[in-house]
Amino acid sequence: MKPIIAIVGRPNVGKSTLFNNLVGDKIAIVDDLPGVTRDRLYRDTEWSGSEFVIVDTGGLEPRNNDFLMAKIKEQAEVAMNEADVILFVVDGKSGLNPLDEEIAYILRKKNKPVILCVNKIDNFFEQQDDVYDFYGLGFEYLVPISGEHKVNLGDMLDIVVDIIGKMDFPEEDEEVLKLAVIGKPNAGKSSLVNKLSGEERTIVSDIAGTTRDAIDTLIEYKDNKYMIIDTAGIRRKSKVEESLEYYSVLRALKAIKRADVCILMLDAKEGLTEQDKRIAGIAAEELKPIIIVMNKWDLVENKNNATMKKIKEELYAELPFLSYAPIEFVSALTGQRTTNLLEIADRIYEEYTKRISTGLLNTILKDAVLMNNPPTRKGRVIKINYATQVSVAPPKFVLFCNYPELIHFSYARYIENKFREAFGFDGSPIMISFENKSSD
């Protein structure tokens, strides 16, 4: 699991500008998935050989003072619990603000490394008096920066790397299948975990997670071990709805990155929501195998097999980027079909780590091309020579051809469908890329 670095601070201190300059050109999503929201709040980045995740807590706009104070407190609390290092951004031009002091008070209550970033300091010698005001907040690390003009960002990142280099990040047990139970508040995640770790299965141990309110539960079922990562304790929606739902997204991200398989919990009574789509999009972008679970199926009235079919069609239409994911209808409360999820997780993880021989792969590719040649583009005839699988988890295939830049995404999707028809890969994302054929 990569360390998480959270940027916090009151509105208009330059958090998002700092975020954008820290991640650089990675802000542009090159290989975007159809239907996945583009406005992500986080990026993987690297500095001096260390990899970590930068999280922006921007997007909090005040409506009134009570609302603003409540949201800032909530933001700082979440950053404390979720992040490994906190970048606390203040505005050096406007000076120390009572809201800065409120955030500082909250951040000091927990033993998390905080780097105080005094922003909008383009010239330290001319603005040093502006910086000195902030030493009274009492943090060990203080760096004057300019997020907009990239002043001192390297020094700030050096401190980040030094801090995380001294941290102990435990190795995950490779023998245990790690299942992330993700979803919005009240979808039944904790109920599912409790049911799976009930009397019929043996709880081996409870391990406190890296956050205050996440619990990893190690269970055994049919001689197999599973580590269930539950994002328990996600805050209920605030009185004022927030479109970005930052808090659920950050916790889901941490769980997804650790997981071998993701279980996306949906509320069958409520149906698919924008927050569900956002969390599903993260799992898809992280290229994890996923099971879509319609929970609270026992509460749906007047249902039959046709109801299931209709809901599946609607879900796949709303989540086209998860067309490969199996959909299960369960009741975490009664236990209906819950153990099916463990067996499905085993099955789709096998698909996720499956390797296809080059000979068999090219037999299927040849048949697919004979059935449907790549369309001629710009007067050029595209010839696909051969394919090979270059990796697993997720399965990645490279197809060599003469004009890879002319391959349309619809033809790549056609090849993916043919590979799925032949080899399965149920529940698993697969990656297909086209490259120039080698000179020999």
From Swiss-Prot:
Q: Which GO terms describe its molecular function?
A: GTP binding; ribosome binding
Gene source species = Fusobacterium nucleatum subsp. nucleatum (strain ATCC 25586 / DSM 15643 / BCRC 10681 / CIP 101130 / JCM 8532 / KCTC 2640 / LMG 13131 / VPI 4355)
Nucleotide-binding found in the keyword field = yes
Task: Tell me its family.
Answer: Belongs to the TRAFAC class TrmE-Era-EngA-EngB-Septin-like GTPase superfamily. EngA (Der) GTPase family.
Question: Which keywords accompany this UniProt record?
Answer: GTP-binding, Nucleotide-binding, Repeat, Ribosome biogenesis
Q: Which residues form a coiled coil?
A: none
Q: What is this protein called?
A: GTPase Der
Ligand binding (GTP 2): 183-190, 230-234, 295-298
> What NCBIfam families does UniProt report for this protein, alphabetically?
GTPase_EngA (TIGR03594), small_GTP (TIGR00231)
InterPro entries to which the protein is assigned, alphabetical: G_ENGA, GTP-bd, GTPase_Der, KH_dom-like, KH_dom-like_a/b, P-loop_NTPase, Small_GTP-bd
Segments forming domain EngA-type G? 3-168, 177-353
Task: List positions binding GTP 1.
Answer: 9-16, 56-60, 119-122
What task does this protein carry out? GTPase that plays an essential role in the late steps of ribosome biogenesis.
The protein's assembly and partners: Associates with the 50S ribosomal subunit.
Single GO BP term: ribosome biogenesis
Q: Which residues form the KH-like domain?
A: 354-438
Is GTP-binding among this UniProt entry's keywords?
A: yes
